[in-house]
Design a protein with these regions (language model features):
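Flavin-dependent oxidoreductase catalytic core characteristic
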Residues: 3-387, 391-400
Length: 400
């Protein structure tokens, strides 16, 4: 136990975790900006390659499947840019609680940024692996972003849990107030339910929730404002998707009950939908600003087409996520995973690399071979002597 003087506290007592988590907000934004820069460079490089590389006497950009990748790269880079601009604006405004938003931005940027760079590699083919074309470094570096600053699997669960906290509390409150409790006798149950039924504050929450959960009646669409008039059809589509997400989130929570806490596939679908809705909102905002500013030219036309294409793709993704809440392959997935795990357990640990932190097999795995990896002389540190060493003296050479 470490005693910290009051004068050295960074915040109020008991708020240490909140301070630590808040620091992650900045890291997730700077990480996302790095992804965006690499994705934009990859987009432009691959698109230029597709225009100048010919196959069958035609540029690659003439082919549908290449055009699909070009459009997707443009759409995702525009969406990442829009989301990051909105996110950094929240930081500059000193908004107090934006952990969900920064987590969503990190997940979206790392997933879609990776897709952009992967598409660029596919367009450039084997040339993409050539160091001189400056894409292979971006391809290698981009993969780590889905792991660092919170692995995306963890972030999906975080967005689900933290973002859905208010809904969960509301549903639990209504259930406690109006549902039958087996721990109470019948008279206590009736008395509690009648008393709460006469409470306007409780019924104002219980009736709309009951209409959705019991009668499956969807609520009204939310009102979206501030967009450019030309984008009203897209704002209406976004409002409908927000309503559908809220409705099916409630139904999924009722269907899975307490099991939803451990079913990460369901959590990921709900989180991914919320993240795409956030991205669509950011895209709508950015495109509205461009239209109001009277931006023109080929770059704007590219941005406008990319934004509208992203809306189409995001809508398809959201509808698929909603459909998969009820019809999916989760059961066979768990069975297949269990069978694969059971088989792997029969294989000797000595044939495989095992985590040094494994509580069950540390030290039993295959030894790592490092002869082919360049090592610094002098062990783990590069010894520079008196500071007057020549280049030859500090040249990195592989071990014999």
């Amino acid at each position: 136990n470490v005693k910290v003087p009051v004068a050295n506290r960074l915040h109020k007592e008991g708020k240490g975790l909140n301070v630590a988590l808040t620091c992650l907000n900045y890291g997730r934004c700077t990480l996302s900006s790095g992804i965006l820069g690499a994705a934009k460079k990859a987009r432009d490089q691959a698109t230029k390659w597709a225009r100048t590389r010919y196959q069958f006497n035609r540029p690659l950009s003439d082919f549908d499947l290449v055009q699909e990748k070009i459009a997707r790269m443009a759409a995702y880079t525009y969406a990442i840019d829009a989301m990051l601009y909105m996110m950094t604006g929240m930081l500059d405004r000193h908004d107090s609680d934006i952990m969900v938003e920064t987590a969503a931005a990190k997940v979206f940027a790392s997933e879609m940024g990776w897709q952009v760079i992967d598409d660029a590699m596919q367009i450039m083919g084997g040339e993409g692996y050539m160091t001189e074309n400056e894409l292979e470094r971006a391809f290698r570096d981009a993969r780590i972003y889905r792991i660092v600053e919170g692995a995306n699997e963890v972030m999906w669960s975080f967005v689900f849990a933290y973002g859905g906290k208010q809904l969960a509390e509301q549903m639990l409150g209504v259930q406690t107030a109006m549902f039958y409790d087996t721990d109470e006798n019948p008279f206590e149950n009736i008395g509690r339910m009648v008393t709460n039924a006469l409470n306007p504050a409780i019924m104002s929450r219980a009736i709309p929730l009951g209409l959705q959960l019991v009668l499956r009646i969807k609520p009204k669409k939310p009102v979206i404002s501030g967009y450019h008039p030309d984008l009203r059809p897209f704002a209406d589509r976004l409002a409908k998707l927000v309503r559908d997400h809220s409705h099916w989130f409630k139904l999924a929570s009722m269907k899975n009950k307490e099991h939803i806490v451990t079913r990460q596939t369901i959590q990921a679908r709900i989180s991914d939908t919320a993240i795409h809705l956030f991205a669509m909102s950011a895209v709508l905002s950015k495109l509205s600003a461009q239209l109001r500013a009277g931006v023109r030219g080929t770059e704007f036309l590219r941005d406008q087409a990319a934004a509208l294409h992203f809306f189409e793709m995001a809508e398809l993704t959201i509808n698929e996520n909603i459909r998969a809440l009820n019809k999916n392959a989760d059961r066979s997935m768990r069975e297949a995973a269990k069978a694969a795990i059971d088989h792997t357990d029969t294989l000797s640990d000595g044939k495989f690399y095992i985590s040094e932190r494994s509580p069950v097999s540390a030290g039993n795995g295959r030894a790592t071979e490092q002869q082919h990896i360049k090592q610094f002389p002098g062990g783990s540190q590069l010894e520079m002597g008196d500071g007057r060493s020549t280049d030859a003296e500090v040249e990195v050479k592989p071990r014999a």
